[in-house]
């Protein structure tokens, strides 16, 4: 059994004129939400073995904050450029290729791809939108990430910052 947790980056700052999309930092809400969502995961004992993030500043910062809160070693956080504005097919390829022996893999990315990826992986659930810093976790009855297939996951968790005000 494998567990995949998808995390959309926390809320980012759009206020800097001329800011390149790749370089957008987290805003105050994002800086608050990322550690809070990590604490929720920790309270449910959902600590990943490996994390893979888009290298865009907002995604990588979210991943780094969550890694620190979840006490995941920095060596277990990997960046992959294919996750920046990735399609579901791109994300599937990254997970299959880089999941390795992780029993619980956490992937950080962007909309719309990450919401679409969650929906295409789920055998039964559909979410309209994975909000910023939202977390979607599914379980897969596979022994190897290379066997991950569409519509094969059973939703285990769906949470987001405004779910518990």
Region roles according to the model:
Residues 44-46, 98-103:
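Glycine-rich phosphate-binding loop signature in dinucleotide/nucleotide-binding domains
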Residues 125-156:
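Domain-level recognition of soluble alpha/beta enzyme cores
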Residues 2-83, 90, 127-128, 165:
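Active-site-proximal alpha-helix that buttresses catalytic centers in soluble enzyme cores
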Residues 102-118, 122:
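A glycine-rich beta-strand to alpha-helix segment
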Residues 154-165:
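Charged phosphate-binding loop/patch that engages nucleotide di/tri-phosphates or the phosphate backbone
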Residues 11, 56, 112, 142, ...:
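Short, glycine/serine-rich, charged loops/turns that create anion-binding
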Residues 4, 103-106, 135:
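Residue-level preference for the first positions of well-ordered beta-strands
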